Amino acid sequence: MAGFWSKLFSSEEKPSSAQTAKDRLKVIVASEQGLGRRLSQDKIDQMKKEIMQVVSRYVSGVGEQHIQMQVRSEANIEMLEMNINLPEER
């Protein structure tokens, strides 16, 4: 996991800013067990609103329809996966 963060924030040759933004905005929070039981749909919706408010400070045109969040299981790990589709610049 440390390799992931060091790649995002290292001072070596950097990928395009669009790719960096995409990588930073795709967030996966993993838990060994019980994430789905701890996060109700109301909590996910509230988290979505708060994330939208933060992102909209830096990127114009981002709304709730641009943020997708889901809880899924993979290899006995439950994950909260979030994707933010940035609108085209006008």
Curated annotation (Swiss-Prot):
Cross-referenced HAMAP family: MinE
Pfam families (UniProt xref): MinE
GO terms of biological process kind: cell division; regulation of division septum assembly
Keywords assigned by UniProt, alphabetized: Cell cycle, Cell division
Record function comment: Prevents the cell division inhibition by proteins MinC and MinD at internal division sites while permitting inhibition at polar sites. This ensures cell division at the proper site by restricting the formation of a division septum at the midpoint of the long axis of the cell.
Ranges where the record places region Disordered: 1-21
SUPFAM superfamilies reported in the protein's UniProt record: Cell division protein MinE topological specificity domain
Basic and acidic residues bias (residue ranges): 10-21
NCBIfam families referenced in this protein's UniProt entry, alphabetically: minE, PRK00296.1
Domain of life: Bacteria
Entries under InterPro entries matching the protein: MinE, MinE_sf
Protein name listed in UniProt: Cell division topological specificity factor
Disulfide bonds: none
Family: Belongs to the MinE family.
Source organism per UniProt: Acinetobacter baumannii (strain ATCC 17978 / DSM 105126 / CIP 53.77 / LMG 1025 / NCDC KC755 / 5377)
